[in-house]
Amino acid sequence: MERLNAEKAASLAIAVYVIIAFVFPFSAFAADFAHRLNSEKRSEKEGLGRNEVPLFKRIPGPGKEAVANKLIGLFKNSKTPITTQGTSKKQVKGNRLSIIGEDWFLDVNGDGTNVRYRNYKYLDSKPELAKSVSERLSNEKLEELGRVFIKQTLSEYIKIGANEELIPFYTEHAIGGGGQAKEGAPADEEKVYASTIVFTRSIDKVNIIGAGSKVAIMFNNKGTPVGFDYDWPQYRPTGKSQKVLPVEAIKNRAKKLASLDIDSPDVKVKRFDCGLYDAGVRKHDPKSVVQAGCAIHSYEKKIIDHDAYKRDKNSGHSVGAYTDFIPAGETVEEDGKWPQAMKMHGKNPVSRFAAPKDGPKLK
């Protein structure tokens, strides 16, 4: 049940879930799990698939300093590529705390529920591990490896609450090669350099959309973890619920709030997925609740040079891609950092399409 496409990771992301680019200056193959495909099919026909949803609050984490110190201690004696050995220095920029080692770095954001780790030197030093695209790690293998790493290493941070599920969402494979070393030479073989699996969460069978409740693990071709990202809070019920619009009403609302004119023949909607919207800690309004929403991923193709485009369909045009998160409740709860929700309350956000990335940053 995987869908394979060879698009740039950045176009999948958001322009996010977006959604996602690697450290590598390469293209990426992306493969969706059945859950994502089925969720999009259900969303297209039924929206959230229910008339009412409970509202939740993100529980604040222990703080970025506390989480950074614990992770440094966790990996200081590691014999794997995920290590915090050696000298390091701290940098603070806004709500981000960065610990920078000789070969690695660790970013902890906001209240400590958003973390990113990379060991780029290890990846750069192992070109011999590259494999042909056909030999890439399968979705099933990446899910297995990812679950083991989360259970054995990140279980203190990736907690699964009552009525919650950790769900495999999609994978991406960083691809290099495919070009010519010189004009007239045969194209180099495309090879996989690393693979990433992204998990999401559901509560009572309702998906979390947005950057919150995402965890991504990057592996080399031997199945060794070399990096991870997560934005993973705990939630508490508010005791309140929200009535949800039917799908056609959500789509009509999207026509008014989306960044692109989705009725235009030049605009294509790539994805439509509904659930509970959590923007992630970096775009989170502490006063807001996690409420019903739908993610709409759309792109617009504009012909700039008609002559060039006529000669070659791969040139002479530009493509703009966006991910908008559309409130799906009959009554929309206030959220000072959700542009579309602000507009529903008659407020003008700084950017109409300042949508957070739908998943951890992987570049």
Give short role names for the model-derived ranges:
Residues 146, 217, 295-297, 301:
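Conserved histidines in hydrophobic membrane contexts and catalytic metal-binding motifs
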Residues 13-25:
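Bacterial N-terminal signal peptides
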Residues 276-291, 300-309, 338, 350, ...:
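Accessory, solvent-exposed terminal regions and/or long lumenal/extracellular loops of proteins
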Residues 197-199, 206-215, 219-230, 235:
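Extended amphipathic alpha-helical interaction segments
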Residues 29-196, 203-204, 229-255, 305, ...:
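Preferential activation on post-signal-peptide N-terminal prodomains/segments
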Residues 232-297:
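Charged, low-complexity helical/coil segments in non-catalytic cytosolic or luminal regions
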